[in-house]
Every structure is written in structure tokens, then in C-alpha cells.
């Protein structure tokens, strides 16, 4: 008896880590239907674009990609085959009807809280009957419906614990595309984490739009992290993305007490001007952010700080931008992400007066990036001569080379056996670059944490 040919599934992921997680879970949902992942869209039976709506450029990329997909779909139809095209994620949530109007090649649209409905939507598309757009805000229903088993490759994995946002920063579409803040039950999270550890995952990154606002039936994020830290084989825990307003004392204490909680924290600030922060509805000041960083560093002196910045927000003058540079100099970031303000339809900031010229945005972004690059290089140079535990994840580009991650999230390159992949190994750092470190394997094991 011959086996049924596997159906080919191509997923292209745009945007944040949560979209990466969502794409993996879509594959899990579709696997029982016979779909297997392929690396290229040409010839695929099902193409899913998992989209990001944070910036205008990301949205336009989707429509551009759909033009290419339409041609592929036509070629497959001419050859007697069928390609089903789905748009998922935040653009789907925000512009579902517009997507289907602008691009008839799209067969179905599914928002980020409804991708568990993909099998039914695909069936409707094949029957050419029924609603083929789902943008429900039902995160609890989604997670209850997802398969318990995840198929992961590698020793690091993302794990969504919280979704949505109640902060309503005036520049941001997340509350409109992901809905309000919602937290998964801790038991469900622990079960998924244990299953990951059983598959050889050594490091998990807990995900949420406001992950430190996690509230799982009396569980704060700190309490959840302490619970997960007890799972055998799960040696490293990270989390992203955080809001300064929700950085509680218990979470700061966890950074100082738990060796499993990595000394790396991504804590967006966006701007250094209180006037701009107020216009953004950030609910913190530059000074309160700086004091918070000081408190975190008192608990964990070696912590590497990362941040997000937006330049050219409406009303930002030269003096406001200089205050952002001042904040960067005072805090000192190991890494950061910086962007020009992007006007998003429906957000309060899009209608604000004082929209900044694109050329001014570009000049400010260049200056900010230069300062941030200098700080990142300086942080990496400070690691030279130190020995640190590195979780090796994959083969390097050069023969005999393996690549892993430091506790501070830098890529670390070393010559070593592939047998070390999946292992945490002490490495003496001997060189640094902007984005990575180079080192040699130590023969002596690292001392146990005090």
C-alpha cells in the first residue's frame, strides 16, 4: 500500500518573535492534515504569510510578496495543481477585507488569535463556500485548541505566555491587532515547557507583548519563572518584551537570585524626552526609567540591557532628540533596536500635529545608531578575557566551527566538535565584533553558581 504524498506547506514569517512562535504552532495545527514544511513557495500546496503590522514598510512587503505568490499560483494551476494562499498575523487582523479585495489570489485570512481555525478555513476555501476570514479575539480558545505536542528543532525555543496589550501607546497598533492583555494558565505553560525540555530544549524565551504584565491566576511573571526554573533539563530562561511600568520588585529579585534567568533584559524606553514620552502615553519618565535600570543593576550587576527607540515621533524637536542621546549615554546599552517613527492608520499619533520630515528622521536615526553601535562594541570588548557558559546551537560557516549563545545573547563562535551542540560549555572569549564574540573551549568546567 503506497503512502499518501505529503502536502507541501510554506510559511513566511514577518516581524516579532511571537510571530515565529505562531508560525511553528500553525505548522503543528496543519501537520495532522498531512502538511510538511518546505523551504520555498514554488510548488507549495499551501502558502501562509504570517504578517507584521507594526510599520508601514512591513505591511507593504506583504502586498508585494502576494504579487509573486499570485504568479506562482497561476503557474501551478496551469500545470493542473492547486495552491491555497493564506494571510495570517497582524496585517490579516487589521486589513482582512482589504487584503481579499486587493489580492484575489488570497483564499483565506486569519488573525493571530484564530489560527487554530486554519483547518476549517482551508476546507471552506477548497469548497469555495462559507466565510474565509476569521479575526476573532479568542486567545484562550486558541491555546486550548492547539496540539499539546510541538515539533521543535534545536535547543532553544520560544514559548508564548501572554498576548495583547492594555497600554495603548499612541504610536502602536498592537492593542488593535492582538487585543487586550491575556495570560495563559501557568499549568498550561509548564506543561509545554516540560514537553520542550523532553525534546532536548535547554533554553526557552517567554513571549508576550507585555510579558512582565503576566497575570496567570495569581501568578506573576516572577513566580512563573521560578516555577519553570525547577524543570529538569531547562537550564536557561529569558523573556521579552517588557514594559517599564510592569517591572515589579519580585521580578527584579528573581534576576538576582535565579541562575536560570539569564542576565539579559530587553526593556524598551522609546525616547529620552519626557514631553515625547507623555505624547506617546508611555506612563513613565526618562528619570524613572534610569532609576529602574539602577535598581535592576543593583540586583544583577552584570545584566546586559537592551532597549527600543523611536526617532521622529510627532512633535520631536532637536532638543527632545538630544535628550534621547543623553539617556542612552547614561544607561549604556549592550544592544538596542531603533526605528524611524512610522505613521500607522487608526493610532492617535497618526493624527498628531508636528509630523517630522523623513530626512530629519533619517539623520536622527543615523546619529542614534552610531552611538548605540559604539556601546554594543564596547560591551562586547569587555567580555574579552572572560570565561562564560555558552549554549552551542549549530554548526558555523567555517569548517570545524560551532556557534552558540552567551548568557548576554551574543553569538559566540568557537572551534569544536559537533558533539557539543546542545551542550553548555565554558568558553574563554578571545575576540569581539559588533554582533558576536570569538573564543576557545575551556578544558576545566565552570564553577557551580554560588
UniProtKB/Swiss-Prot annotation:
Binding residues annotated for [4Fe-4S] cluster 2, in chain numbering = 165, 169, 172
Name the InterPro entries for this protein: Elp3/MiaA/NifB-like_rSAM (IPR006638), Methylthiotransferase (IPR005839), Methylthiotransferase_CS (IPR020612), Methylthiotransferase_N (IPR013848), Methylthiotransferase_N_sf (IPR038135), MiaB_methiolase (IPR006463), rSAM (IPR007197), rSAM_horseshoe (IPR023404)
Q: Which reaction does it catalyse?
A: N(6)-dimethylallyladenosine(37) in tRNA + (sulfur carrier)-SH + AH2 + 2 S-adenosyl-L-methionine = 2-methylsulfanyl-N(6)-dimethylallyladenosine(37) in tRNA + (sulfur carrier)-H + 5'-deoxyadenosine + L-methionine + A + S-adenosyl-L-homocysteine + 2 H(+)
SUPFAM superfamilies for this protein: Radical SAM enzymes
**Description of how the protein assembles with itself and partners:** Monomer.
UniProt lists the family membership as follows: Belongs to the methylthiotransferase family. MiaB subfamily.
Give the record's cofactor note, including how many are bound. Binds 2 [4Fe-4S] clusters. One cluster is coordinated with 3 cysteines and an exchangeable S-adenosyl-L-methionine.
- Please state what the protein is called: tRNA-2-methylthio-N(6)-dimethylallyladenosine synthase
Keywords for this protein: 4Fe-4S, Cytoplasm, Iron, Iron-sulfur, Metal-binding, S-adenosyl-L-methionine, Transferase, tRNA processing
* Gene Ontology molecular function terms on file: 4 iron, 4 sulfur cluster binding; metal ion binding; N6-isopentenyladenosine methylthiotransferase activity
The MTTase N-terminal domain covers 7-127
Q: Which cofactors?
A: [4Fe-4S] cluster
Indicate yes or no for the key word Protein transport.
Answer: no
Domain Radical SAM core positions: 151-378
**Record-annotated residues binding [4Fe-4S] cluster 1?**
16, 52, 90
Database matches in NCBIfam families: miaB-methiolase, MiaB/RimO family radical SAM methylthiotransferase
Q: Name one GO cellular component term.
A: cytosol
Tell me the classification of the organism that encodes this protein.
Bacteria, Pseudomonadati, Pseudomonadota, Alphaproteobacteria, Caulobacterales
**Can the keyword S-adenosyl-L-methionine be found in this entry's annotation?**
yes
Q: One Pfam family, please name it.
A: TRAM
Location(s), subcellular: Cytoplasm
* EC number, UniProt record: 2.8.4.3
Ranges for domain TRAM come to 381-443
Amino acid at each position: 500500500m503506497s503512502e499518501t504524498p505529503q502536502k507541501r506547506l510554506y510559511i513566511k514569517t514577518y516581524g516579532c518573535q511571537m510571530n515565529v512562535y505562531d508560525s511553528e504552532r500553525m505548522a503543528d495545527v496543519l501537520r495532522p492534515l498531512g502538511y510538511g514544511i518546505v523551504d520555498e513557495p514554488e510548488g507549495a500546496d499551501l502558502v501562509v504569510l504570517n504578517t507584521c503590522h507594526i510599520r508601514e514598510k512591513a505591511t507593504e512587503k506583504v502586498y508585494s510578496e502576494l504579487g509573486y505568490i499570485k504568479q506562482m499560483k497561476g503557474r501551478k494551476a496551469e500545470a493542473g495543481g492547486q495552491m491555497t494562499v493564506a494571510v495570517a498575523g497582524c496585517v490579516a487582523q487589521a486589513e482582512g477585507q482589504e487584503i481579499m479585495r486587493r489580492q484575489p489570489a488570497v483564499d483565506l485570512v486569519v488573525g493571530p488569535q484564530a489560527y487554530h481555525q486554519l483547518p476549517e478555513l482551508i476546507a471552506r476555501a477548497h469548497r469555495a463556500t462559507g466565510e474565509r476570514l476569521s479575526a476573532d479575539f479568542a486567545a484562550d480558545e486558541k491555546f486550548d485548541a492547539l496540539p499539546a505536542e510541538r515539533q521543535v528543532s534545536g535547543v532553544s525555543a520560544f514559548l508564548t505566555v501572554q498576548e495583547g496589550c492594555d497600554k495603548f501607546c499612541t504610536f502602536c497598533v498592537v492593542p488593535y491587532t492582538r487585543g487586550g492583555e491575556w495570560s495563559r494558565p501557568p499549568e498550561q505553560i509548564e506543561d509545554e515547557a516540560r514537553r520542550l525540555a523532553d525534546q532536548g530544549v535547554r533554553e526557552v524565551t517567554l513571549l508576550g507583548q507585555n510579558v512582565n504584565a503576566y497575570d496567570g491566576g495569581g501568578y506573576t511573571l516572577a513566580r512563573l519563572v521560578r516555577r519553570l526554573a525547577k524543570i529538569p533539563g531547562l537550564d536557561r530562561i529569558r523573556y521579552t518584551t517588557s514594559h517599564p511600568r510592569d517591572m515589579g520588585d519580585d521580578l527584579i529579585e528573581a534576576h538576582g537570585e535565579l541562575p536560570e534567568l539569564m542576565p539579559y533584559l530587553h526593556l524598551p524606553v522609546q525616547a529620552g524626552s519626557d514631553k515625547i514620552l507623555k505624547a506617546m502615553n508611555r506612563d513613565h519618565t526618562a528619570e524613572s526609567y534610569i532609576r529602574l535600570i539602577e535598581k535592576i543593576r543593583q540586583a544583577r550587576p552584570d545584566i546586559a540591557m537592551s532597549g527600543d527607540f523611536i526617532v521622529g515621533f510627532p512633535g520631536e524637536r532637536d532638543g527632545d532628540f538630544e535628550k534621547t542621546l543623553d539617556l542612552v549615554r547614561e544607561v549604556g546599552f549592550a544592544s538596542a533596536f531603533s526605528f524611524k517613527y512610522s505613521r500607522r492608520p487608526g493610532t492617535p499619533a497618526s493624527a498628531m500635529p508636528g509630523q517630522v520630515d523623513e530626512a530629519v528622521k533619517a539623520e536622527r536615526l543615523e546619529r542614534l545608531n552610531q552611538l548605540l553601535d559604539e556601546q554594543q562594541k564596547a560591551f562586547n570588548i569587555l567580555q574579552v578575557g572572560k570565561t562564560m557558559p555558552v549554549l552551542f546551537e549549530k554548526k558555523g560557516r567555517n569548517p570545524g566551527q560551532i556557534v552558540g549563545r552567551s548568557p548576554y545573547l551574543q553569538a559566540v563562535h568557537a572551534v569544536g566538535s559537533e558533539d557539543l551542540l546542545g551542550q553548555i560549555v565554558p568558553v574563554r572569549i578571545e575576540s569581539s565584533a559588533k554582533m558576536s564574540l570569538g573564543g576557545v573551549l575551556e578544558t576545566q568546567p565552570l564553577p557551580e553558581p554560588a
